[in-house]
């Protein structure tokens, strides 16, 4: 589009062109009032992206304020590229999770790949070296050819980017439910390490300092990507492929090294990734956070397409680009540094005192807007909220235990449900050992990486059972945080903090907004109780296809500190003769369970209950026992219940099984999904010390029979399962469905 064809301010108003960009009538009137005149085409574009839900959180801010965001270890909470938590010895961990759902629904390979690239930039823009990646994925049922295609391409995109850039993808989760058929969820998380003195902020301080553009050149890809992410998917979304960016991991690898070297220089004042809304968000936010203004000369923007307009340059979401502010007079050092890595570094503006964002192109001023108006003054909406119609009905249901004829066959079938089955097909495509710091690889409760030069480790996980949250958003929200912490504890880590990715449907629907409010209430309560503040995250709304929303899916990414690598614990049995313990009571809780879904083909009723005081007490006891060296293996009891958890601990070992006795109604003790439960094994000589430290019931022992045998309280055999047969079924389920 050439400048001649852009509508003038009067046309923008009269023909409601602003509405096509995503602004409402009221918002356009606000823009007019802020500027004291009608905005031109470029200015309308700036407001439309910065005031989109994706950039401004205008529909979710009132809810997000409920999260606890401070703690004695928190060095940086929400508001910067990523959050930062102190881990002692002048070191800190930097982490964040973000969604790339809409792009991945349209162009799954590039959508997923650029999601990984974007989250990596958020972490190294803080000054940290990225050391690990995780992801949380949701798809429809694998029987559908379209879902198979999305699944295969998303995984390939994550692998393609992560492997090329040389950062290990160490963990995550994949779940399958029909509601994600048309709108998959792709949440990517990056974890980095930093020394305290290297922490950088995305702020443009110092009038007269120089604004520079570094990294890849700008094209027309991703224009209005932030607006695209703030609307529902529909049949016409396929036509929006141009809105999906294309990533170059090799360019990003060079960009990481160049930026980390730059951060060691005292020439750098501020640095920010050009993410959603590209140059617009990075310039407006850096100026606004510093209480300054910025002038930019768009003729100097490196462009890989001809005839780009100011509108296109400002709204492009081309990848692998950063905006930096450097001390005046030090520009040549920066150019030389980036040249060494084969990258462009171009002076394109300066910091001003008057808080305005001014853009010049071809010797003309093409936009003049207060930086705060873009970055901070988006309208905040308190959307109407209404309890979902299904909720009261589910709460009143009398829950019956699903009928199970053959316990062994049921266990075998559960192990083949894609949500429970081995994800080896997924993580075998990821290089999870690159950088040689990975101590616990994918497949256990949490991944663990070594903090080099110390005896410490970082445990990390992503968790969210969206079925529970659909049935009861508040309780489900508590469970998501509690399960993440349980996974960290089972790996020998002390839970530190969380990042979240709130994936929901259209917030303008009162029942969806109710889901958002309630799940955040539950998560906030759990974060306070477990002392894991929220240090950052992302909101992804409008996850709907043809009016049908996905399950509410507020994914939790949690990092924990392993104080000594001797404490690292995994889920698989270690040796025959070890004693098997179960911590926690089992109730007949089947709402949202894998068994319920498998037998009835749908979920209904009440989600499992959770008592956060009990959860905290058990986690503290288990962690103390692990740190005292009393625990051989630890596994949290999740999808599929105790029978699945015990079998998973046997599958991970070689040639080991277990004989256990479980009291209570058979279907419940085997397959119910009650919360706050662990399966722990302990050496026989540690029996007394362990039982003194932890409230647990010894249920049996690890055997070298390669069989899992479970008895009831009358000592009748409920099931005997050959571990090799179970492993084969569990490992083969996903590859079999993809054939």
UniProtKB/Swiss-Prot annotation:
Catalytic reactions of this protein: N(2)-formyl-N(1)-(5-phospho-beta-D-ribosyl)glycinamide + L-glutamine + ATP + H2O = 2-formamido-N(1)-(5-O-phospho-beta-D-ribosyl)acetamidine + L-glutamate + ADP + phosphate + H(+)
Residues the entry annotates as binding Mg(2+) 2: 122, 273
Record GO terms (molecular function): ATP binding; magnesium ion binding; phosphoribosylformylglycinamidine synthase activity
Disulfide bond residue pairs: none
Localization in the cell: Cytoplasm
Top-level division of the source organism's lineage: Bacteria
Role, per record: Part of the phosphoribosylformylglycinamidine synthase complex involved in the purines biosynthetic pathway. Catalyzes the ATP-dependent conversion of formylglycinamide ribonucleotide (FGAR) and glutamine to yield formylglycinamidine ribonucleotide (FGAM) and glutamate. The FGAM synthase complex is composed of three subunits. PurQ produces an ammonia molecule by converting glutamine to glutamate. PurL transfers the ammonia molecule to FGAR to form FGAM in an ATP-dependent manner.
Protein name: Phosphoribosylformylglycinamidine synthase subunit PurL
EC code(s) of this entry: 6.3.5.3
GO biological process: 'de novo' IMP biosynthetic process
Residues reported in the UniProt entry to bind Mg(2+) 1: 98, 538
